Amino acid sequence: MSMAHGHAGEENTDGCRTYECGFVWIEEIQIMGERNVIKAALLGAGTVGSGVYALSEMLKDEMFQKTGASLEIKKVLVRNVKKDRPGIPKEIMTDNWQEILEDEEIQLVIELMGGVEPARTYIVQALEAGKQVVTANKDVLAEHGQEILTLAENSGCDIQFEAAVAGAIPIIRPLKQSLAGSMLTEIMGIVNGTTNYILTKMSEEGMDYKEALAKATELGYAEADPTADVEGYDAGRKIAIMSSLAFNSKVTFSDVYMEGITKITSDDIRYAKEFGYVIKLLGVTKLVDGKIEVKVHPMLIPEQHPLATVRDSFNAVFVHGEACDDAMFMGRGAGKMPTASAVMGDIIIVMRNIVHDNCGWNGGVAYKNYPVKPIEETRSRYFLRLQVADKPGALANIAGVLGNNDVSIAQVVQKRARDGVAELVVITDSVLERHFNDALMIVKGMSVLREVSGIIRVYGD
């Protein structure tokens, strides 16, 4: 190939085409076999896998422009080779992983199977065989991320996983590269579109939780079994991955405290608005005094906060660093084409690295083994709704118990009594979780208490 001038994709008088590849113009000779072809295997042909295959066919010229090579998906690993998959030729389908692993022509493995096994085994074996890997598998990375990244580094192989956390939102590379000098101290993310859609409908249209979940299911945002979404497990895997990268320390899914949105009520939404807040399910990780906090739970955040404006199924990640201050990344966090587009971005990076012989994961000199702080030792403000007997002194007695256990009240509203029961809505100052729990246990034993209707953490220290 030679240097040339012209517009990308423009045919010259000699029958060649010129492409802009970075800052270099590349001339493609129209002779069979002249292109550098990178052969890949796609593991999984489901929603995202089929999207990746379709994009790889649509973007052939664009990929060559950006990398100087062409991509050929030589094999697609599926469970059932007899099943018709529109757009994917049957002759490239296989149910035999060993056939892919032992094929020396295949340089790149694109893992889109989901689940921990056999995906983890396939990723490990691919890296051990010297193959580059792109994956969107948050389950594997949240459980075995450090093991896999260390293996990639030691074997001199690429592993890219931008799509594993927030779909089309670019956050993995910024955490590893652009923000590497920012001294990050906190990440907060709306990283589950299903729960954000549900909470948006509850807030804006007055739906209760069951109505909003039914609507999310109808639109395809929620699975038939929504447990992983609504209980915070999906967000927990994503915040574990981001925490590991941000603080260069091992954080796994089992380290994450998780609390979902199933107990959020219309009353919680309404009272939050009265105080100037909206409720979001957030993944949060902080580095405080050499210890990592990592958790997922609903939170009241001020209406003026950037995350408060993230609606429906959109995702967003908000980061704070001592050097960079605040930054937010927002976009589609899931879906066939948004996720496939993030996978394609990773594929293009790996292809470019193969062409320039620059493969390999660089995780840094060493991991910092920061301990993960137990949830009982973290601090938060709290929103607390109590149903109490409508008797003189009830509020004073409860305030006294809270105060005696280091729980200071920042705001309190007493709602009109009904049938001899009054509702107290309290927002506390920042308090240790264990002190708050100790106080709550005592309050639950008080004769004036009828019910604890809601407990939600509040943004701010």
Task: Specify the residue positions occupied by each region the protein language model found.
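N-terminal glycine-/serine-/threonine-rich beta1-alpha1-beta2 phosphate-ribose binding loop
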Residues: 27, 32-129
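Short hydrophobic alpha-helical segments enriched in small aliphatic residues
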Residues: 6-8, 15, 20-24
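Rossmann-fold NAD(P)-binding glycine/threonine-rich loop
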Residues: 120-125, 138-165, 172-175
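Substrate-binding/catalytic subdomain of NAD(P)-dependent oxidoreductase enzymes
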Residues: 211-309, 314-316
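Catalytic, metal-anchored helix/loop core of enzyme active sites in primary metabolism
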Residues: 184-188, 196-199, 203, 215, ...
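Oxidoreductase and adenylate-handling cofactor-binding alpha/beta cores
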Residues: 171-184, 195-207, 237-251, 346
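A conserved regulatory-domain signal marking ACT and ACT-like small-molecule sensing domains
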Residues: 347-461
